[in-house]
């Protein structure tokens, strides 16, 4: 089950880079995910979830801007994979299976990045505009992250 959750949080990172890691940070801060004593303990620190949430909100805004680069360019793609990998490790770490979590989270980020781009493109074409498609993607990312964290 832990690998499925790591994969799913990776998919969320593929949709929205900061949403996945912000959700994991909230889980650690609220005590749903024990990262104490690990190199990821900082995710549960007092201000970390607030900072990551602010960054996630900023990402929601900048994603709507016309000059924002594609999620498939190397820097954007790499950031999503890194976020998915770290989030996957955080989910798997309490069980001692961090390598599997890293792989599952990174793989999920690739799936989320490519699948999310394709789905959003089709939805934007169907709706005639990108903004509604982007907002649907935002909602899926947030609800998905909450559901994954809720299953921890």
Which role fits each region the language model picked out?
Residues 1-5, 27-47, 87-103, 147-152:
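Helix-coil boundary and interhelical linker segments in multi-pass alpha-helical membrane proteins
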Residues 8-28:
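The first (N-terminal) embedded transmembrane alpha-helix
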Residues 25-26, 30-34, 43-62, 76-80, ...:
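Alpha-helical transmembrane segments and their juxtamembrane interface "caps"
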Residues 57-72, 114-126:
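C-terminal ends of transmembrane helices
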Residues 59, 79-88, 137-142:
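Core segments of transmembrane alpha-helices
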Residues 70-82, 104, 129-136:
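Cytoplasmic-side transmembrane-helix entry/capping segments in multi-pass membrane proteins
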Residues 82-93, 102-118:
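Mid-bilayer segments of alpha-helical transmembrane spans in multi-pass integral membrane proteins
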Residues 135-152:
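Final/C-terminal transmembrane alpha-helix of multipass membrane proteins
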């Amino acid at each position: 089950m832990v690998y499925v959750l790591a994969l799913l949080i990776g998919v969320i990172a593929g949709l929205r880079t900061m949403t996945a890691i912000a959700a994991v940070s909230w889980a650690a801060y609220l005590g749903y995910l024990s990262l104490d004593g690990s190199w990821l303990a900082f995710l549960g620190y007092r201000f970390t979830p607030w900072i990551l949430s602010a960054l996630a909100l900023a990402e929601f805004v900048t994603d709507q801007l016309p000059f924002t680069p594609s999620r498939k360019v190397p820097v954007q793609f790499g950031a999503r994979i890194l976020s998915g990998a770290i989030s996957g490790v955080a989910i798997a770490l309490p069980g001692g299976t961090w390598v599997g979590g890293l792989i599952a989270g990174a793989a999920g980020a690739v799936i989320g990045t490519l699948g999310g781009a394709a789905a959003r493109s089709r939805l934007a074409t169907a709706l005639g505009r990108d903004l509604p498609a982007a907002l649907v993607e935002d909602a899926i990312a947030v609800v998905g992250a909450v559901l994954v964290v809720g299953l921890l």
